[in-house]
């Protein structure tokens, strides 16, 4: 069975280039995994395509806004379900999260589908993590 991996990021072109090479590239070519990268900026509602803002409730630095991430994830989940895939296991990749170890990769590899949400800036608005994250 082919594993489906979707990546929500601000840098989909960079992800595509890296994930088309080496072991992952060969796995894609052989049909072991199906991979798609999604641009979070495409889901903003402002003309400037801005995705960062001050943290809700205050705090230092800038965080990724909840709305474009939420809309992107909901759209990806809908697309996957319409294509006959199960709801993906949603993982938010942030500096404050659990380290990505070999053991964690083995656990994630057992899932039928994944939606990896890549953080940037000081982090991700906690409200979207609470709403969507499985991890």
Map each language-model feature to its residues:
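N-terminal nucleotide/polyanion-binding subdomain common to many enzyme families
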Residues: 1-83
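Generic recognition of short, well-ordered alpha-helical segments
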Residues: 18-22, 103, 127
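S-adenosyl-L-methionine/SAH cofactor-binding core of RNA-modifying enzymes
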Residues: 65-120, 126
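Receiver (REC) domain switch/active-site residues of two-component response regulators
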Residues: 134
